[in-house]
Regions:
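Terminal, non-catalytic protein-protein interaction segments that mediate quaternary/complex assembly
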Residues: 1-138
Length: 138
């Protein structure tokens, strides 16, 4: 099990997706099997939330919903909160990698990745860092 110390030893996203509940259930492989069996499925949905153990920490990225409406794999992700100062970019990169993995396994093109975020924020301690990032991106 991969634990994240800064989150009070909560399970990592990787372990939540690849070993859901600590019982060896790989949810990404489940999505691939589901869409392989029914390419039009609208319920290839997985979660990082583990209600039996998540009593104080709720994962920020909580739901990944895959579908292939027209030959490309679309991914909609829901997050209740994202720290864009230090974690948002890494989250997006990893979500895109998972989308690519599923699309490749199914022989599909990668479609859009939609990220629905209830609370996107930057902490005060990261303002200077973010100003530097923005200054170099233009």
């Amino acid at each position: 099990r991969s634990l994240v110390a800064e989150l009070g030893d909560a399970r990592s996203y990787a372990s939540r997706l690849r070993d859901y509940g600590g019982v060896g259930r790989d949810q990404v492989e489940w999505v691939i099997a589901r869409l392989r069996a029914d390419p039009q499925s609208r319920s290839a949905t997985i979660t990082t939330f583990e209600p039996l153990i998540d009593t104080t920490y709720i994962p920020c990225v909580s739901m990944l919903d895959f579908w292939a409406p027209a030959g490309s794999l679309e991914l909609v992700v829901y997050a209740h909160s994202i720290d864009f100062g230090s974690k948002g970019y890494g989250n997006l990169v990893q979500l895109a990698a998972i989308q690519q993995e599923v699309a490749s396994a199914l022989g599909l093109e990668v479609g859009s990745l939609t990220f629905v975020i209830k609370s996107a924020h930057v902490y005060d301690t990261e303002f200077d860092y973010m100003r530097g990032v923005l200054a170099h991106s233009s």
